[in-house]
C-alpha cells in the first residue's frame, strides 16, 4: 500500500525534485536563526518559555483552553486517544485515516481499542454514516467513546472537510456521549484553502492538533490542544510514553517562526498542486483529480508500467514521488517551485512516452 523509492542511492542520480511529501522540507536559514536565538528551559516541568509561548499561541489559534507540545503528529494521535478512551473502547474513524492504517496499529498495541472503520468518499464520512454506526450502551458491544476526523484527509486526496459537516458530526457525537478528536496534520492547509479560520474549523471538537513538520516547514513538532482537564490527561500519557522533553524550545522556535512566515504561503503549494494535476491530465494514460490542497493523487491505469515501476522510473530521472493507499502521490511544499512542477511534468511525460514506445515496439516484434 505504501512505497517510497530510495532517496539516497549512490547508483542513481541525485534527487532534483522532491515531491515525496511535505515532510521533506529543509529548515530555512532564517528558521535556523530563530532556533539558535530561542530562550529555552526544561519542558518537562513547564519551564521552557519558547514552548510555553508556542502552546499558548496554538491554544488561542484553535480556540482551546490549553495545549501541549509533542515531538510528532503521531504521538498527538496516540496520547489523545489514550486520554479519551480506555481498553475495550471503540474509536470511529474513516477507514483510510492515519489513526487506522498508518500508526503501526497503536490503538490495539497500546490502547486495547477497537476501530470501527467508516466508509465515505475522499476520506470523509457523513453524519448519516456515523449515525448508522452508533449503538446504545450495551454489555455485548464495545463502548463507543471517540469519533476521529482528519483535516485535510491524507489518503482521501487532501480534501477539506466543510465546517457544516464537521459541526454535524461533532453535534451527533456529543449528543451520544462520544468525545471528538481532529487529526489536523494539515489543518492549516485546510484553513488557507477554504478561508475558514483554524478556530472555526476546530470549533466543537474536543481535541485538535496541528503538525509543524508538514507544510509549515519546521524540522519537527506538533501541538495538541483541548480543555485544561484533557491536556492534564495528555500530559500523563506524554510522560508515560517518554514524550516529555527538555530544552525543546529550540524546536518550538521553528514552529513559532513557521506560524509567522509559512502559513499564508501554503496557497502557493495549492496553486502548484493544481498546476501539476492540470498538466498530468493532459498526458495520455494519466488521470488526476483537481486537488483542493497540496496532495496530488493520480493514476496511470492506461500505462503498461506498474505503479512501482513508474515511481522507480521517476526516481531514475531525479524526481521523487510515492505510492500511498495504492495510488501515486505527489506532494507540493515550500521547497518546490513552479519551475520544478514544469520540470516534473516533463519527466512524467518522458516516462509515459518511453513506456508507450516500448509497448509499440513489443507489438511490432510480435
Ligand atoms: C503525517 C500525518 C500524521 C502523523 O504526523 P507525524 O508528524 O508524521 O507523526 C498523522 N495524520 C495525518 C493525516 C498525517 O498526514
Where are these regions (language model features)?
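Conserved PLP-enzyme active-site core in the AAT-like
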Residues: 2-336, 344-366
Amino acid at each position: 500500500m505504501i512505497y517510497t523509492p530510495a532517496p539516497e542511492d549512490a547508483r542513481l542520480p541525485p534527487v532534483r525534485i522532491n515531491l515525496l511529501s511535505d515532510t521533506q522540507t529543509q529548515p530555512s536559514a532564517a528558521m535556523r536563526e530563530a532556533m539558535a536565538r530561542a530562550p529555552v528551559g526544561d519542558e518537562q516541568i513547564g519551564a521552557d518559555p519558547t514552548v510555553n509561548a508556542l502552546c499558548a499561541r496554538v491554544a488561542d489559534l484553535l480556540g482551546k483552553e490549553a495545549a501541549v507540545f509533542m515531538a510528532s503528529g503521531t504521538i498527538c494521535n496516540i496520547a489523545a486517544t489514550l486520554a479519551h478512551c480506555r481498553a475495550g473502547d471503540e474509536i470511529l474513524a474513516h477507514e483510510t485515516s492515519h489513526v487506522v492504517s498508518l500508526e503501526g496499529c497503536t490503538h490495539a498495541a497500546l490502547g486495547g481499542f477497537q476501530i470501527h472503520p467508516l466508509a465515505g468518499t475522499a476520506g470523509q464520512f457523513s453524519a448519516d454514516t456515523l449515525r448508522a454506526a452508533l449503538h446504545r450502551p450495551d454489555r455485548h458491544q464495545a463502548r463507543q467513546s471517540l469519533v476521529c476526523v482528519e483535516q485535510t484527509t491524507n489518503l482521501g486526496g487532501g480534501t477539506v472537510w466543510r465546517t457544516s459537516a464537521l459541526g454535524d458530526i461533532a453535534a451527533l457525537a456529543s449528543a451520544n456521549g462520544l468525545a471528538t478528536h481532529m487529526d489536523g496534520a494539515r489543518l492549516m492547509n485546510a484553513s488557507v484553502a477554504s478561508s475558514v479560520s483554524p478556530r472555526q474549523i476546530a470549533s466543537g471538537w474536543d481535541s485538535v492538533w496541528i503538525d509543524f513538520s508538514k507544510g509549515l516547514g519546521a524540522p519537527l513538532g506538533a501541538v495538541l490542544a483541548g480543555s485544561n482537564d484533557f491536556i492534564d490527561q495528555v500530559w500523563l500519557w506524554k510522560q508515560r510514553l517518554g514524550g516529555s522533553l527538555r530544552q525543546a524550545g529550540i524546536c518550538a522556535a521553528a514552529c513559532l517562526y513557521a506560524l509567522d512566515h509559512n502559513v499564508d504561503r501554503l496557497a502557493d503549494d495549492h496553486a502548484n498542486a493544481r498546476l501539476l494535476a492540470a498538466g498530468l491530465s493532459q498526458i495520455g494514460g494519466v488521470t488526476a483529480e483537481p486537488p483542493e490542497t497540496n496532495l496530488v493523487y493520480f493514476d496511470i491505469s492506461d500505462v503498461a508500467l506498474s505503479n512501482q515501476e513508474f515511481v522507480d522510473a521517476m526516481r531514475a530521472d531525479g524526481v521523487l514521488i510515492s505510492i500511498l493507499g495504492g495510488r501515486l502521490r505527489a506532494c507540493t511544499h515550500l521547497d518546490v517551485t513552479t519551475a520544478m512542477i514544469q520540470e516534473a511534468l516533463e519527466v512524467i511525460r518522458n516516462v509515459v512516452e518511453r513506456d508507450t514506445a516500448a509497448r509499440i515496439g513489443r507489438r511490432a516484434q510480435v
